[in-house]
Amino acid sequence: MTTTVAFIGLGVMGYPMAGHLANAGLSVRVWNRSGEKATQWASEHPGAACDSIALAVRDADFVMTCVGADKDLIEVFEGDEGIIANAPEGAILIDHTTASAGIAERLAESAGARKLAFIDAPVSGGQQGAQNGALTIMCGGPEQAFEKARPIMAHYARALNLMGPAGSGQKTKMVNQIAIAGLVQGLSEALHFAEQA
C-alpha cells in the first residue's frame, strides 16, 4: 500500500522537499497559502494540489509542514480547519519550520491529545540542500515515530538525528545558528585585524 504524505507549505525549501517525496513514488498531496504555487507544483510533479489543509491531511500517514514562523504554525495546526483537527488518528506530524521550542512543545501536546505523534524537525542546508536532497535534520519527538518517519525524511536529507523529546530539534537548531553566527563574527574580526596589520 502506498504511503500518503501531505505537505503543507511550498516555499523555497518545501517546494523541492515535497518534490523529492513525489518523485520517490509516495502519494503526495500539497497545500500552500497561495494556491497558485500548489497548482504549479502539481503540474511539475506526480501529486495533487488541495484547496484546504483539511483535504490535504485527510487519510495521510505523514503530514509535513514547512512554513514561516510560530504564528504560521498556529494557523496551519490549530482550529477546526487545521492539521490537528483533521489528520487521522495515528498520523505522524513532522514540522520542518525553524520556530521556537515552546511552539513545538505546545503542538506536541495538542497532537498527543488526539493520538497523533509530533516531531519538530528544523532543517539546515539551505535551498541548495533542499534541491539536492542533502539536508541535515535535527529532530525532537518520540523515538518510535522518528524511526517510522526516518525513511520518509531520508528522501531529502543527508543526515537525520533524534536529539530528544519535543522541542529538542528546535533547541539544537538554535545551537547551530549561534555557532554559525560566532564563526562569522570571528572571521569578520580576523579579516579586519589582517587589514589593519
Predicted regions: what is each one?
Residues 150, 172-178, 182-197:
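Anionic-ligand binding region
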Residues 53-58, 62-63, 70-135:
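Rossmann-like NAD(P)(H) cofactor-binding subdomain of soluble oxidoreductases
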Residues 5, 98-178:
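Rossmann-fold dinucleotide-binding core
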Residues 38, 107, 190:
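Aromatic/hydrophobic pocket-lining residues that form π-stacking "cages" and hydrophobic walls in ligand
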Residues 1-65, 91, 96-97, 127:
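NAD(P)+-binding Rossmann beta1-loop-alpha1 motif at the extreme N-terminus of oxidoreductases
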